[in-house]
């Protein structure tokens, strides 16, 4: 088992299981929240750039 920082006691199996469960929950949170938010921001940026350039093209044609 791993040595806990600043403590003489080593990590127990129960502590290891709880730590792994917390890591798994954190990973699931990233997958379900952070990635879709980043994707939405990226899509909005692309839509903004496309709309800004298409407006500019209309003026250039006249």
From Swiss-Prot:
The keyword Membrane applies. It holds the Pfam family DUF4519. The keyword Transmembrane applies. Residues 9-31 form a coiled coil. The chain crosses the membrane at residues 30-50. It is a single-pass membrane protein. Keywords: Coiled coil, Membrane, Transmembrane, Transmembrane helix. It is found in: Membrane. Its main location: membrane. Residues 1-27 are annotated as: Disordered. One of its GO terms (cellular component) is membrane. Belongs to the SMCO4 family. This is Single-pass membrane and coiled-coil domain-containing protein 4 homolog. It comes from Nematostella vectensis (Starlet sea anemone).
């Amino acid at each position: 088992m791993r040595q806990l920082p600043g403590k003489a006691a080593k990590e127990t199996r129960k502590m290891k299981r709880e730590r792994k469960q917390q890591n798994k929950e954190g990973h699931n949170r990233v997958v379900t929240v952070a990635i879709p938010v980043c994707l939405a921001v990226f899509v909005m940026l692309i839509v903004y750039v496309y709309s800004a350039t298409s407006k500019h093209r209309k003026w250039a044609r006249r």
